[in-house]
């Protein structure tokens, strides 16, 4: 069952769920807790690659990704990152999240931002049981105007569901977990599949 605001506050107070820095109770509503945008971004560089063969040999896929992805772009507090129409960018939450083996999290974008064309997570909105780290956001601007994104602005909300029991393979214990303990806007690691 989805956790209520009272249960989220209790889970934060007793350390069942850890969000650092801890959100104020004002950031907790009904069934969710707001998360903010961090200051790290990555974009696709101008490139001449005609395509990336996602099912190709791992070294070739990784080499192609390395050619087209930018290094981390740091945006200081108070400044803005501009996401132009039709552009995809990776970013990271300001908060780091730790979940136990019996709770799954879900990230939702804000409706007010979606109404301007901003998709906060293109597809990956599940936060696995056992997750520990910052959450990488997959931004896409489907609107008509560039959007200024500033570090620490409220960007989405997390809600949580308690499972019927702990999972046997929590994310932080899996040997093949590609994004374990991520703290940066980590690019795709599909070559590790």
From Swiss-Prot:
UniProt keyword list: Hydrolase, Nucleotide metabolism, Nucleotide-binding
Source organism superkingdom: Bacteria
Catalytic activity: dCTP + H2O + H(+) = dUTP + NH4(+)
One GO MF term attached to the UniProt entry: dCTP deaminase activity
Pathway field: Pyrimidine metabolism; dUMP biosynthesis; dUMP from dCTP (dUTP route): step 1/2
Region (Disordered) residue spans: 171-193
Any one Pfam family match given in the protein's UniProt record, by short name: DCD
Keyword Hydrolase: yes
GO biological process: dUMP biosynthetic process; dUTP biosynthetic process; nucleobase-containing small molecule interconversion
Gene3D superfamilies: 2.70.40.10
Assembly description: Homotrimer.
Family from the record: Belongs to the dCTP deaminase family.
Function: Catalyzes the deamination of dCTP to dUTP.
Entry protein name: dCTP deaminase
